[in-house]
Every structure is written in structure tokens, then in C-alpha cells.
């Protein structure tokens, strides 16, 4: 869950995003049914260690992390996804208690709609490489 923790740490530290989505609505895991929108869920899609010649206690790990935005309208969902992308820069260094080798955007997911209740959802994946 370290990739998820890294992404959440960056999101809740971004004042522009927090002006639209409060920190308590930026959560690790799936957004619960009935949550007042907008909300952001952060989930781990996959992870794998990087094979290196070096064999010590430090392992470089890559997680694919998906950030899903649920909002009441399509324009709102798209603008929040843009804020999410802005809040997660290509970065190297310490984030929370983890050392990040890199964070890079990956695939943007499909737009998903539910008419009852009115929910517009979309996602953005990130590749998070960190020392585990």
C-alpha cells in the first residue's frame, strides 16, 4: 500500500485540490456508496519489485496506483482530475516516510456515468517507484 500512501500524501498536501475536495474525502480504497461528492479514491492496481544486482535489504518497488474522482457533473470531474494531475508532479525524494525514485502519470481511465444518483467518475493511473 506504499504507492497509495505516497499518492494520498501528495494529494492532501495540495491547497488547490483541498479547496475543492476536503482531505477527509481523499481516501485510500474505494469510495463508499453514499459518500457526499466530490470524493477521490486511491487504489493499488499492481506492484512488482525491480530486479537489481544489488542484494541488500533495500528493494526498489513499482506500484501502479489509480486515482478515481467521483463528482456530481462531468465538468467538475474533469476539473478535479486536472487538479489531481497538477498535485502529483514527476518527483524524486522523500514523500511522507517513503523515498520515491519517481512518480509518473500513466493511463487515463474511461469516463463512467451513473444517472441515479447523478455521478460522473474518471480515473488517472500513476507509476510510483519507491524504496520498500
Q: Across the structure, where does each feature detected by a protein language model lie?
A:
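Generic preference for well-ordered secondary structure
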Residues: 10, 26, 51, 61-64, ...
